[in-house]
Amino acid sequence: MGTNKYDNENFFDKYSQMARSIYGLQGAGEWHIFKKMFPNLEGKSVLDLGCGYGWHCKYAVENNAKEVVGIDSSEKMLGKAKEINNDVKIEYINSSIEEVVIEKDYFDVVISSLVFHYIKDFDSVCKKVYDGLKDDGDFVFSVEHPIFTAEGKQEWYSDDAGDIMHWPVDNYFIEGKRTSNFLGEEVIKYHKTLTTYINTLLKCGFEIKEVIEPMPPKEMLEEIQGMKDELRRPMMLLISARKRK
């Protein structure tokens, strides 16, 4: 991932004001669906790739995981994780996903939330996860939806009055680097098609269990201004897969 944008103090301060930073998993619009894709975590060894504040790590412990390892390349993220989501069963490691070494056939469950669109080589990640999982181990992750990442800027098209017209989808089949604006900063992401996400998992030996394009929960649609616009295009893609014996 290179230099981590989240270690920029100004950017990190803005991120810390987001709902999912303040309220944790309950502040994430996809959580009500994402959590249902997790297997039973009791007694399991769990790895969280790109753990951020450690919300998913703490959730795993609260659901009786045996041990949890959280990986993140941002020192500031891990500092916050150790502050608000620390536990004797959780080990936080400062490393990029590309460089971290995962012990072979060790973990029962690998999870990742909204990270892989920052990584260029999804194939290498899948191979690493597959090797690190035990037989019948589960890989559950979320990414920004390819429709959301395709054009790059990640902004609605609006008319002269400022009213939203549509979401632009362009260069969908041209995968690779995109420059978007997130929290007022230029952020580099890597667009991949839906086919790439699915077929890469299959090629690496995974069995696809479930693919979901989540909608915000009813209460968010009713209570948060502008949230109903999220029904006009998918923002996220959730996938669960299993390592076949």
What kind of feature is each model-predicted range?
Residues M1-L41, W55-Y59, K80, F139-E175:
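Conserved class I S-adenosyl-L-methionine
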Residues L47-L49, Y53-E99:
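Class I SAM-dependent methyltransferase SAM/SAH-binding core
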Residues E98-V110:
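A short acidic, Gly/Pro-enriched loop at the edge of an enzyme's catalytic core
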Residues D108-F122:
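A short SAM/SAH-binding and catalytic strip from SAM-dependent methyltransferases
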Residues D123-D138:
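A short glycine-rich, Lys/Arg-flanked "PGG" loop and its adjoining helix->strand segment in the class I
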Residues G176-K177, I188-V211:
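Short alpha-helix
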Residues T200-K245:
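C-terminal lobe and adjacent flexible extensions of AdoMet/dcAdoMet transferase-like proteins
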